[in-house]
UniProtKB/Swiss-Prot annotation:
Predominant localisation class: secreted
Protein purpose: Antimicrobial peptide that shows higher potency against Gram-negative bacteria than against Gram-positive bacteria. Has a very week hemolytic activity.
Tissue specificity remark: Expressed by the skin glands.
Biological-process GO terms, alphabetical: defense response to Gram-negative bacterium
Family: Belongs to the ascaphin family.
Keywords: Amphibian defense peptide, Antibiotic, Antimicrobial, Secreted
Organism: Ascaphus truei (Coastal tailed frog)
UniProt entry tagged with the keyword Transit peptide: no
Official protein name in the record: Ascaphin-3
Intracellular or extracellular location(s): Secreted
Any one annotated GO CC term: extracellular region
Length: 24
């Protein structure tokens, strides 16, 4: 459903942000 898509996008976003922070 729409909520699952939102959850997936949020997870991917957090993963990306965490990756950027880890690279610094």
């Amino acid at each position: 459903g729409f909520r699952d898509v939102l959850k997936g996008a949020a997870k991917a976003f957090v993963k990306t942000v965490a990756g950027h922070i880890a690279n610094i």
